[in-house]
Amino acid sequence: MDFALDKKYEMAQNLFREFAQNEVKPLAQEIDEQHRFPRETVEKMAKYGFLGIPVSKELGGQGCDILTYAMCVEELSKVCGTTGVIVSAHTSLCVDPIVTFGTPAQKEKYVPDLASGKKLGAFGLTEPGAGTDAQGQQTKAVLDGDEWVLNGSKCFITNGKEADVYIVIAVTGIVEKRGRKMKEISAFIVEKGTPGFTFGTKENKMGICGSSTYELIFTDCRIPKDALLGQKGKGFNIAMHTLDGGRIGIAAQALGIAEGALETTVNYVKERKQFGRSIAQFQNTQFVLADLATKIEAAKLLVYKAARKKDEYQSGAKVSYSVEAAMAKLYAAEVAMEVTTKCVQLHGGYGYIKEYDVERMMRDAKITEIYEGTSEVQRMVISANLLK
């Protein structure tokens, strides 16, 4: 197996890294402290084509693969976890399901504007009583003539109030499967500004504070009949497919956060002096850094493998990338939490001060163990595959 990256990946990586250092890093502390969505950064990313990386050129995207997209999220997240998740939620959770399951008319209507960054996307699955458990969904969609009527709410929605296009999962009936009555789940495309669609609570979060995380509320919200995404009753499959891809994005985010924390800590320990010498000369420091670097490299291999596996799938190969995505997300997220925690420790008291990036990075890392399926859910996915 060749682990070397082709020249095209190195060029893309350098572009993402340069943009992150010049355009994202200078604002990272400010947007965290002010809990401010970085609209100006999103507009710049749109000009660079970062919001349509894996979308075909025919639909207005860059025509690149999932690995290139993962590298973009990784490099952005090295300096700002917020910016990384904005791109991930937009691309994996909104653009991808429309490209994969949308009708030609839906693709033509929505994808070019999303891929160009003219519009931003979001995904509404989670509810107060339903996340991983799709059967716990309470949001309902009832067909009334030529319109669907949505009622219910969604919570913890990334890109919440800033998005323009939303994929919304709702109950469309009751069906019987294997002798059991179950909720029929369907997916819909909903636009901001639709009457009956409003925003509720803005979440005051521990980390990724610049991310717009809102409650979505639907009160007799009428959307066209053709807003149904995919087939009626196939919403669960669409949601699971979407989360599989989303896990690659979050794994890349976690990887980037871990890499950023290690990089800033290596620079810090070289300069920090104790007992007449830099703490980089202490064996304890060296061993901690060695362990963290090794785990980061292992996480990177898992993330890149999952991205390549999805590329194979999208090229028409009869393969699944669900387990690879779960493994990458599980391991990268837990590594990010370990790396950032130990990097704070190596900073000593300064690691607890907001002026130092590792403090923010540790707070940002925690959410990667939670959204797009908790670490426990990833273990369920992996073990189910082993035991089938």
Model-derived features: positions:
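A short core secondary-structure module
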Residues: 146-147, 151-199
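Short Gly/Pro-enriched turn/cap motifs at secondary-structure boundaries
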Residues: 129-132, 156-159, 178-180, 205-212
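Alpha-helical interface subdomain recognition
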Residues: 1-89, 101-106, 113-118, 131-134, ...
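Long, acidic (Asp/Glu-rich), low-complexity accessory segments flanking structured domains
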Residues: 219-238
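Helix-loop "lid/cap" segments that line or gate small-molecule binding pockets
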Residues: 92-100
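A short, Trp-centered hydrophobic/proline-enriched beta-strand micro-motif
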Residues: 117-125, 169
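Flexible, small-/acidic-enriched active-site or ligand-binding loops
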Residues: 136, 193-224
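Short Ser/Thr-interspersed hydrophobic loop/turn segments at strand-loop and sheet-helix junctions
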Residues: 49, 73-77, 170-171, 190-195, ...
